[in-house]
Curated annotation (Swiss-Prot):
Start and end residues of each stretch annotated as Disordered: 1-35
GO cellular component term of the entry, any: viral nucleocapsid
Function comment: The role of the precursor might be to condense the viral prochromatin for encapsidation by virtue of the two basic domains.
This protein's name: Late L2 mu core protein
Length: 84
């Protein structure tokens, strides 16, 4: 007799499968604990990188405050030039 398989119910939007990462700071070294399936994988690194963020958005966001200050100072320069 053939056994019928029930159709698996899936939600409308499928969830992306990601691995959970948890950072554990110990006295000796910083280790990253990754859960993959049922296993736990330990990764340790000798050098701890703190505060090294990569600049996102390219070069323009870095120039934005400088450009804003330059544009804001134009009226003051014009007024000072007219007074002479």
């Amino acid at each position: 007799m053939a056994r019928l398989r029930r159709a698996k119910r899936t939600s409308y939007r499928r969830r992306r499968r990601t691995t959970r990462t948890r950072t554990v700071v110990t006295r000796t070294a910083r280790s990253t604990v990754r859960r993959r399936g049922g296993r736990i994988v330990y990764r340790t690194s000798k050098t701890t990188r703190v505060g090294t963020r990569r600049m996102r958005g390219g070069f323009l966001p870095l120039l934005a405050p400088i450009l804003a200050a330059a544009i804001g100072s134009i009226p003051g320069i014009v007024i000072a030039a007219k007074q002479k």
